[in-house]
């Protein structure tokens, strides 16, 4: 892989990882257009590792929130009188809400990495989930805040999150934000919950995939092109920087805007992918 391709893919990952537009779908189509085999061991390892950059960006951005939630959860475990703290409940919610996606990832690992990685699946999921987001965005009474989250809310959001690895085009953030909206949280809170619910799952998946696939970076081929550690590290750093900016922008955007633009964007991208497949520019 050359340095320019590494920068391009790092930017794509950084921009799309936390937006409700499917980072997996974008990476796969861009990797295809750049000439890589998206089911090749090398490019699969590359994709898993550069996602760690975006995950680190989220941890850095929400570090004070993470520390506050962890401290509240630990205090609640030690002292019953501290269990009324909303952050204690949120801590349990994040733990319980992370279980469904972990189970799905382990049980359906082979299908996720093969059959379900088809660009047809990505394109159709991008388009169809836009309708789900549209319904969620038009819920009445979207006024619940972060302090109102309960265990049931977290489990519902977690179950929605578990759909993302099964159907890559759905987008993990698209699924969790939609769930938050259906639970009547305001858009800003639904988005922040999406980050909090996603961080444990993304960290676990990132570590697992990176460790298990790291050797493929140096010995495997991404299509006809070797990947290499230099471009991989560069892409990871680029994804970290771009993802940090993307997170800040998204939180500011949702504080005063609906998700309509993202919905239409998803439909357009889905149709473009279908067009590229039908015209044999890329293979599914």
From Swiss-Prot:
GO cellular component, one term: plasma membrane
Keyword Oxidoreductase applies: no
Reactions this protein catalyses: di-trans,octa-cis-undecaprenyl diphosphate + H2O = di-trans,octa-cis-undecaprenyl phosphate + phosphate + H(+)
GO molecular function, one term: undecaprenyl-diphosphatase activity
Transmembrane segments: 1-21, 43-63, 88-108, 116-136, 149-169, 193-213, 225-245, 259-279
EC number: 3.6.1.27
GO biological process: cell wall organization; peptidoglycan biosynthetic process; regulation of cell shape; response to antibiotic
Compartments, as annotated in UniProt: Cell membrane
Keywords attached to this entry: Antibiotic resistance, Cell membrane, Cell shape, Cell wall biogenesis/degradation, Hydrolase, Membrane, Peptidoglycan synthesis, Transmembrane, Transmembrane helix
Highest taxon of the lineage: Bacteria
Membrane topology term: Multi-pass membrane protein
Family in the record: Belongs to the UppP family.
Extra information: Bacitracin is thought to be involved in the inhibition of peptidoglycan synthesis by sequestering undecaprenyl diphosphate, thereby reducing the pool of lipid carrier available.
Function: Catalyzes the dephosphorylation of undecaprenyl diphosphate (UPP). Confers resistance to bacitracin.
NCBIfam families xrefs: PRK00281.2-1, undec_PP_bacA
Protein name per UniProt: Undecaprenyl-diphosphatase
Underlying gene: uppP
């Amino acid at each position: 892989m050359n340095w320019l391709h590494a920068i391009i893919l790092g930017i794509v990952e950084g921009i799309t990882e936390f937006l409700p537009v499917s980072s997996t779908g974008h990476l796969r189509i861009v990797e295809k257009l750049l000439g890589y085999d998206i089911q090749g061991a090398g490019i699969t390892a590359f994709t898993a590792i550069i996602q760690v950059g975006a995950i680190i960006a989220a941890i850095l951005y929400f570090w004070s929130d993470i520390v506050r939630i962890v401290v509240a959860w630990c205090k609640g475990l030690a002292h019953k009188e501290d269990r009324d703290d909303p952050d204690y409940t949120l801590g349990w919610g994040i733990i319980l809400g992370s279980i469904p996606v972990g189970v799905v990832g382990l049980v359906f690992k082979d299908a996720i990495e093969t059959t379900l990685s088809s660009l047809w699946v990505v394109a159709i999921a991008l388009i169809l989930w836009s309708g789900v987001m549209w319904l969620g965005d038009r819920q009445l009474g979207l006024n619940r805040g972060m302090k109102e989250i309960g265990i049931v809310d977290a489990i519902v959001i977690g179950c929605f999150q578990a759909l993302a690895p099964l159907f890559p085009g759905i987008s993990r953030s698209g699924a969790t934000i939609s769930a938050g909206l259906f639970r009547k949280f305001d858009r800003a809170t639904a988005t922040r919950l999406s980050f909090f619910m996603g961080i444990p799952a993304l960290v676990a998946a990132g570590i697992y995939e990176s460790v298990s696939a790291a050797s493929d970076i140096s010995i495997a081929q991404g299509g006809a092109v070797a990947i290499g550690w230099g471009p991989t590290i560069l892409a990871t750093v680029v994804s970290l920087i771009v993802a940090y900016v993307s997170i800040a922008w998204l939180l500011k955007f949702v504080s005063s805007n609906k998700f309509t633009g993202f919905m239409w964007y998803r439909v357009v991208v889905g149709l473009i992918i279908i067009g590229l497949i039908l015209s044999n520019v890329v293979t599914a």
